[in-house]
Amino acid sequence: METRKYTKTRRAEQQDETRARIVEATVTLHETLGPAQTSISAIAAAAGVQRLTVYRHFPDDASLFEACTTRYLELHPPPQRVAWADIEHPSERSYAALLAFYQYYRQTESMWRAAYRDLDQVAALQVPMDRFEAYLDEVADDLGLAWRTTQAARRLLKLTLRHALRFTTWQSLKNAKLKDRQIAELVQSWLEGVES
């Protein structure tokens, strides 16, 4: 009986290890080639398994992308609100949040660039990307509430923050040769302009 229990335990461990290798291979290929250019054959080769093994663990693109996104965000978690929650002045709080996201984007640029580039081509990307965008909107709305201003100005502040927190906004300003602090300062001036 002990041998059978050991065999089942070892088999489960091997399946977990295989699954982890497939996920790691997917993360690496999505970051280097992009989701649209990553084939199941390439994932299988990088993970050292057969294509059928990939399908056994991940029967559809949605489950594979969910596992890939979960793993990537475990390794590279986006900035969390607790990092700037104690900053009282709304302009300084917004600046701290923006700078945190811009530094995060710089460190993780290759993955976000590939994901946004391939978003329209890969349906399975939509759910994880929508979830990330929803998180950005929550952060923007939370930052906007800290500003003591009129309702109309607050609406514009939130819209500005939502736009400013997007990877694509950071990317366009980075491509214009601005550093992260310069981008955060520029956006801070937009916010202060809306408030006045």
Predicted regions and their residues:
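Basic, helix-initiating cap at the start of DNA-binding domains
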Residues: 1-33, 37-52, 57, 63
